[in-house]
Amino acid sequence: ISLGTPFSKLLEMAGGVRDGRRLKAVIPGGCSMPVVHGNVMLETNMDYDAIAKSGSMLGSGAVIVMDDTTCMVKALERLSRFYFSESCGQCTPCREGTGWLYRVVKRIEEGKGEQGDLDKLDDVASKIEGRTICAFGDAAAWPVRSFIKQFRDEFQYHIDHKRCMVGSGHADDSEAA
């Protein structure tokens, strides 16, 4: 597709959201890029400036689409596990930080999260970002920071109720930008 194609057109060309579900979130440039609310992406063109304005980047160009059945905590746990397992271990912020991020997100996903975990995750991710030899540390930190920023209510629900908001009948349909 051409640069500048509306995301809504790209989604249509790809067959839409599976099973006619509601679009919840999109990672427009591969798993290392910040996540964007679905309603924002539906109004966004697939070009560098528009994606930057939405709060993300085109990155690798891989587009990850998540529907309203996606648990954002579980999605972040999977991404964090990848970065933890793939870190080369050469520099301390990435080696130690990716493991710490993964373990805390996993704990939240398992219903063992604690008050303050979200602020701690953001703080640790901010200390990895820009402090590693290569860009891998940034790639590990950006999803954590953006998932918490964009879907904090869902993460907080996991901590407060020890279970997922998705499928509980309490999912917040409001889409914060």
Question: Where on the chain are the PLM-derived regions?
Answer:
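Redox cofactor-anchoring modules in respiratory/redox and cofactor-processing assemblies
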Residues: 1-177
